[in-house]
Amino acid sequence: MNFKYIVAVSFLIASAYARSEENEIQSLSQRDVLEEESLREMRGIGTKILGGVKTALKGALKELASTYVNGKRTAEEHEVMKRLETVMRDLDSLDYPEEASERETRGFNQEEIANLFTKKEKRILGPVLGLVSNALGGLLKNIG
C-alpha cells in the first residue's frame, strides 16, 4: 500500500513540475513576442524621425547645391560641392535600399539587413551633419 502512495505522489509531483516548466516556457515565449513587438515599434518611430531628418537634410543640401551652382566656385567650394553630391547620392540610396545595395544584401537574413542599413545611416548622417554645418558656416561667412 505504501508503494502505491509513493508512486502516486511521485507522479503528482512530476506532473506538477512538468506543468510549471510548460508554463515557464510559454511565459518566456510571450515575453519574447512582446519584446520583439516593442523593438518593431521603436524601429518604426526611429525610421519616421530619421525620414524627417533625411528630408530636411536633402532640402538643405539641394538649396546649398543650387547656391553653389549659380556662382563661381573656388577649389574649396568645388570640393564641398563634390561632397554634397556624394551625400545626396548616399541619402537617395537610403530611400531606395533595395536598388542601392542589392548586391550587398544577397544571402543575408532580415536582421543582418536591418543592422546593415542602421550602420549605413549612422555612418552617413555623422559626416553629413558636419558637412552641412561647415557649408552653412561658409555660406554665411561669404554672405556676411
Curated annotation (Swiss-Prot):
The modification Isoleucine amide is found at I143. Residues 1-18 form the signal peptide. Keywords: Amidation, Amphibian defense peptide, Antibiotic, Antimicrobial, Cleavage on pair of basic residues, Cytolysis, Fungicide, Hemolysis, Secreted, Signal. One of its GO terms (cellular component) is extracellular region. It is found in: Secreted. The keyword Signal applies. Belongs to the bombinin family. This is Maximins 2/H8 type 1. It comes from Bombina maxima.
